[in-house]
Curated annotation (Swiss-Prot):
Name of the protein in question: Hemoglobin subunit epsilon-4
One BP annotation, GO: cellular oxidant detoxification
Keyword Repeat recorded: no
Family: Belongs to the globin family.
One of the record's GO molecular function terms: metal ion binding
Lineage per the UniProt record: Eukaryota, Metazoa, Chordata, Craniata, Vertebrata
Length: 147
């Protein structure tokens, strides 16, 4: 289990309060699909994913990105029980969707990049470390059913 300090929790929560979930979520998922094109196979129903501009403008990518980032909001509220918080999603991604758990880490990295882009002044090394710890912990929680 990952332990978050009071300072780490406060840092994550302070930035989260400023996040536009739709924008950051959509951009994060779009970046994942562009930079790691093999991840597109999990989104066959999303339609046109044939170019960077098609992915960035795809409403299904934006909607699912928002959904993914909303789950991070849930994580922030339950930082002391991430495995329990993500148990159902872990089971879904493992047993039904068969998503390679490495993709969770890759998406976490995309979220960090987008946050750093949108909040460059607030995204200090300490902030980045707190968010990196959270995205890694969420990735591990999502991969829990794989073990």
């Amino acid at each position: 289990m990952v332990h978050f300090t009071t300072e780490e929790k406060a840092a994550v929560a302070s930035l989260w309060a400023k996040v536009n979930v739709e924008v950051v979520g959509g951009e994060s998922l779009a970046r994942l699909l562009i930079v790691y094109p093999w991840t597109q196979r999990f989104f066959d129903s999303f339609g046109n994913l044939y170019s960077e501009s098609a992915i960035m403008g795809n409403p299904k990518v934006k909607a699912h990105g928002r959904k993914v980032l909303n789950s991070f909001g849930n994580a922030i509220e339950h930082m002391d029980d991430l495995k329990g918080t993500f148990a159902d999603l872990s089971e879904l991604h493992c047993d039904k969707l068969h998503v390679d758990p490495e993709n969770f880490r890759l998406l976490g990295n995309m979220i960090l990049i987008v946050l750093a882009t949108h909040f460059s002044k607030e995204f200090t090394p300490q902030m980045q470390a707190s968010w990196q710890k959270l995205t890694n912990a969420v990735a591990n929680a999502l991969a829990h059913k794989y073990h």
